[in-house]
Amino acid sequence: MEKAYNISELRFENDYLILTADNQTIKLRLKDISKKLAKANEQELNDFKISPSGYGIHWRLLDEDLSVNGLLKLYQTKSPKNQLHI
């Protein structure tokens, strides 16, 4: 199976999700991504699984699924004040 994305990092810092996919790192506010993620505690946030294809991320405790493609598109549409490219 060909990987959609090569995800090398997914972590949380304050109220942000930081994702490195295909050597591109993006930082998005949790409240801009998902209400469930924005309200989650540290344990809930860190209990995630990246799909084998690298296409999606699943949070078991939150019953939340997000696509990496969707996160990258959201990053591209956010205004410069709401995003940070690392």
PLM regions: where:
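Motif-centric detector for short Cys/His coordination patterns
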Residues: 1-86
